[in-house]
UniProtKB/Swiss-Prot annotation:
This is Synaptosomal-associated protein 47. PANTHER family: SYNAPTOSOMAL ASSOCIATED PROTEIN, SYNAPTOSOMAL-ASSOCIATED PROTEIN 47. It is found in: Endomembrane system; Cytoplasm, Perinuclear region. Forms a complex containing SNAP47, VAMP2 and STX1A. Associates with the BLOC-1 complex. Interacts with BLOC1S6. Belongs to the SVAP1 family. Keywords: Coiled coil, Cytoplasm, Membrane, Repeat. The gene is SNAP47. Residues 20-42 are annotated as: Disordered. GO terms for biological process: exocytosis; synaptic vesicle fusion to presynaptic active zone membrane; synaptic vesicle priming. GO terms for cellular component: endomembrane system; perinuclear region of cytoplasm; plasma membrane; presynapse; SNARE complex. The keyword tRNA-binding does not apply. It comes from Homo sapiens. Residues 154-216, 401-463 form the t-SNARE coiled-coil homology domain.
Amino acid sequence: MRAARRGLHCAGAERPRRRGRLWDSSGVPQRQKRPGPWRTQTQEQMSRDVCIHTWPCTYYLEPKRRWVTGQLSLTSLSLRFMTDSTGEILVSFPLSSIVEIKKEASHFIFSSITILEKGHAKHWFSSLRPSRNVVFSIIEHFWRELLLSQPGAVADASVPRTRGEELTGLMAGSQKRLEDTARVLHHQGQQLDSVMRGLDKMESDLEVADRLLTELESPAWWPFSSKLWKTPPETKPREDVSMTSCEPFGKEGILIKIPAVISHRTESHVKPGRLTVLVSGLEIHDSSSLLMHRFEREDVDDIKVHSPYEISIRQRFIGKPDMAYRLISAKMPEVIPILEVQFSKKMELLEDALVLRSARTSSPAEKSCSVWHAASGLMGRTLHREPPAGDQEGTALHLQTSLPALSEADTQELTQILRRMKGLALEAESELERQDEALDGVAAAVDRATLTIDKHNRRMKRLT
């Protein structure tokens, strides 16, 4: 009977120590019945995180020396294992407590992943699906990005943040998104300028064509005929204009680069790499900085957002398989707003990513206005917190029961961030107005060029 149970859990892949000892008839370890306070606190922290991925696997239960089937779940800050039979969380710990992640073999045969925590607690995971390499690459990526994040972020992950720090972090994130949007608008303005230069060049070419057609339409005995059509005087200016028009595209216009775990068509094979967002498209590189694929902006058919940390990019083809890549990254929340600006009509938020849409239901103007008023109100309450002379006791009681006010350092930092955001918003508004005028000019130039080309076509038909 015991051998049959072992065959059910990972086909006998247990640690080779004291196999003859039987376990409790209940089959539930004593540690599981009485979880410690650290375990409960970790579960509460993880409940606030977004689940990035879940894999079926088995976990080696050290007290009973047997393997338990369940689900391994990863969030941006935590890792946990839940059993299939009872739905109970056996293991739950933050990524910041991990010391080492290794690929090992259980019983020298079965491939496993071992995770070493602070305090020398070692966890064994085996029978990982779709494969051990996929699970290892994704967990290692998020662990590494957490360690490489801002200094002190890992050490202060478990320390509760004050209201001023939370508000400062919120405003800093809003400022970064506003900077990314302003950068996209700047490159978009460069593209409009390039289009306008191309239209000016086309208009000058049409003027040359008009003179050539006039030369051809004049009779042979006309004494004022010239030989403009035999010599191309516009060769040198054309070269200069073409070089000028291609100037913005030579810089490639890199918006953002992030590390990512990349899979091509299938999820069973992944590799670490990098996603680069350009003005003209998207580039995917491997860990050796070799270009795997480049999506031109007009070639991207759809971008599906599976979660705040996972997207898939697809380009459809007729008669051959589609070109599709799936990317998982800890920095993906920074890229999704930029992709929404560039590929607004091609983005699709799936069920697990609807939290992004709910977080951005209001318009940018409403959000900036609400954030501005909220921060101004908080800073106003911080700066003016002297009680009135007539009601000292009631005000003191109110201050004791209310939330702690902002510190002077937080107030100054918030003031600087708000000032920068206001300047960025004004610059973005002026850039949008300039681009609206440029679009009107482009539309007028296109209409003039269309009329001129139609007129030249009619004149050429009369000549033939």
